[in-house]
Amino acid sequence: MRIKGKTAKYLQKLIDEGQPIHFSLIDPDKVKDIQSLSKVASSLFKAGTSAFLIGGTLGVSKEKLDSILSVLQDFSVPKIIFPSNINLISEKADAILFMSLLNSDDLYYVIGAQVSASIIVKTIGLEPIPTGYLIVGHGGTAAHIGRARVVPYDNPELAVAYALAAEYMGMEYLYLEAGSGAPDTVRPEMVKFVSKYSEINLIVGGGIRTPERAVELVKAGAKALVTGNVIETDIERAIKIIEAMQRVYRIE
């Protein structure tokens, strides 16, 4: 049996307490000014973000990744790599979402990249968090790069089938991804349906722009939400999303 690491235990504790997890996604491609990143990260940390995800769909240099992780070391929440490929790995992070793109037609994204990365992850002592990655609806760049057969927004039954498969293969999380900057999020109805039939912990990301939609997704059964674009375009709204998620926890 695999023993959970420090980051996985931290996340599981939040879930066990009924507290929604908020991941702040930092895309190294879009960070132009390290000093500005420090201010943004400080605002997110003070608002109560649970962890930082670091990653992007397109290529990122190791040097840029390490410089961002160095800035984030000032904040006492986990720094978790959200990998687009095996180059996005660093010993400066606390953990990595060790993901399989479940609905890809390309075996590289299902298992090939994972085989290539596994020895590196082991060697540098990076904590892996087993995660199924499922692209839904719009999909965006992630769907194009990953050659995914996207799950339609209105087909929750198909999402359940993937969720059960991920659960039965021992994955701890299923990340339902609508795509960066998607015109709509994964629908709350899909989240609720998947939560009804599968016990896997659901992460939902893509297109989350308002506190109201964030609350809907949490109440539907999402254990964690990821916001990225809204952090880049409207930090005050991102903070309101975090605060709204915390109110759900306090009220319930």
From Swiss-Prot:
Record's protein name: Geranylgeranylglyceryl phosphate synthase
Enzyme Commission number, as recorded: 2.5.1.41
Cofactor section: Mg(2+)
A Pfam family the protein falls into: PcrB
Keywords: Cytoplasm, Lipid biosynthesis, Lipid metabolism, Magnesium, Metal-binding, Phospholipid biosynthesis, Phospholipid metabolism, Transferase
Chief subcellular location: cytoplasm
Family: Belongs to the GGGP/HepGP synthase family. Group II subfamily.
Amino acids binding sn-glycerol 1-phosphate: Y175, L176, E177, A178, G179, S180, G181, G206, G207, G228, N229
Catalytic activity: sn-glycerol 1-phosphate + (2E,6E,10E)-geranylgeranyl diphosphate = sn-3-O-(geranylgeranyl)glycerol 1-phosphate + diphosphate
Species of the source: Metallosphaera sedula (strain ATCC 51363 / DSM 5348 / JCM 9185 / NBRC 15509 / TH2)
Chain residues that bind Mg(2+): D27, T57
Broadest EC class assigned to this enzyme: transferase
Function: Prenyltransferase that catalyzes the transfer of the geranylgeranyl moiety of geranylgeranyl diphosphate (GGPP) to the C3 hydroxyl of sn-glycerol-1-phosphate (G1P). This reaction is the first ether-bond-formation step in the biosynthesis of archaeal membrane lipids.
Cellular component annotations (GO), alphabetically ordered: cytoplasm
Subcellular location field: Cytoplasm
Pathway the protein takes part in: Membrane lipid metabolism; glycerophospholipid metabolism
GO MF entry, a single one: magnesium ion binding
GO BP annotation list: glycerophospholipid biosynthetic process
